[in-house]
Amino acid sequence: MAGSPLLWGPRAGGVGLLVLLLLGLFRPPPALCARPVKEPRGLSAASPPLAETGAPRRFRRSVPRGEAAGAVQELARALAHLLEAERQERARAEAQEAEDQQARVLAQLLRVWGAPRNSDPALGLDDDPDAPAAQLARALLRARLDPAALAAQLVPAPVPAAALRPRPPVYDDGPAGPDAEEAGDETPDVDPELLRYLLGRILAGSADSEGVAAPRRLRRAADHDVGSELPPEGVLGALLRVKRLETPAPQVPARRLLPP
């Protein structure tokens, strides 16, 4: 080093300047090297305790941390409210869109239902994409509706044959109370012709039995009267009486019972 031409030669000045520059760059800041200057204090001034001097620093450090935590919580709550409002708005928009789509589908279906039907309803469905039936099918597929269930709601259900059968006429013999109406509703349906036939047979049988039994009773009573005591006019009066008794009286037509 002592005989180095860089330090003792003609280039020694340049190398010295380079060393000084390097020392200036790598030198620590003056705040680290400077010693703290103590302020002059009087003898009567008491030095503050270490606890009091350290407490404000901790307080100054804790206060910003608490404020930052509160700000983060407020920001999280605001973000949660914003997300909830956005979710509700999206759900409301989806429900409104689905309702509008169903309304459009029903309106189109009613329009197609009320339109005059052609002889061949399947004609032109495949060729014409703008046909009402094709549009209706696309709308149903888009709305994810069941065409069979929708048609069942629009088409009236067939009336059963029992409801189309004519009911027998109801004969009202007088005012009937609610008990009679309830009893009449509970009775099973019976053919009225069969009822009329049975009632006619019963009435005809009772009338024949009464008509046959009455002349026999009258004949026995007349014979008894003739045998016991004869009238003063003789046998001719008795014969006339028997003849008069044997002639049947005109029968009163029996009342016809009508089905309820």
UniProtKB/Swiss-Prot annotation:
Stretches for region C-terminal inhibitory domain: 221-260
UniProt remark on domains: ProSAAS(1-180) increases secretion of enzymatically inactive PCSK1. The C-terminal inhibitory domain is involved in inhibition of PCSK1. It corresponds to the probable processing intermediate Big PEN-LEN, binds to PCSK1 in vitro and contains the hexapeptide L-L-R-V-K-R, which, as a synthetic peptide, is sufficient for PCSK1 inhibition.
Sufficient for inhibition of PCSK1 (motif): residue ranges: 239-244
GO molecular function: endopeptidase inhibitor activity; serine-type endopeptidase inhibitor activity; signaling receptor binding
Location (main, coarse): secreted
Acidic residues biased stretches: 179-188
Glycan attachment positions: T53, S228, T247
Outcome of substituting L245A: Reduces inhibition of PCSK1
UniProt-annotated stretches for the region ProSAAS(1-180): 34-215
Subunit structure: Interacts via the C-terminal inhibitory domain with PCSK1 66 kDa form.
Disulfide bonds: none
Gene Ontology CC terms: extracellular space; secretory granule; trans-Golgi network
Phenotype upon changing G237A: Reduces inhibition of PCSK1
Post-translational modification: Proteolytically cleaved in the Golgi. O-glycosylated with a core 1 or possibly core 8 glycan.
Tissue expression: Expressed in brain and pancreas.
Pfam families according to UniProt: ProSAAS
Signal peptide feature range: 1-33
Full protein name: ProSAAS
Region (Disordered): 165-188
Function of the protein: May function in the control of the neuroendocrine secretory pathway. Proposed be a specific endogenous inhibitor of PCSK1. ProSAAS and Big PEN-LEN, both containing the C-terminal inhibitory domain, but not the further processed peptides reduce PCSK1 activity in the endoplasmic reticulum and Golgi. It reduces the activity of the 84 kDa form but not the autocatalytically derived 66 kDa form of PCSK1. Subsequent processing of proSAAS may eliminate the inhibition. Slows down convertase-mediated processing of proopiomelanocortin and proenkephalin.
This protein's record includes keyword Signal: yes
PANTHER family noted in UniProt: PROSAAS (PTHR15531:SF0)
Effect of R244A: Abolishes inhibition of PCSK1
Keywords: Cleavage on pair of basic residues, Glycoprotein, Golgi apparatus, Neuropeptide, Secreted, Signal
Subcellular location: Secreted; Golgi apparatus, trans-Golgi network
Highest taxon of source: Eukaryota
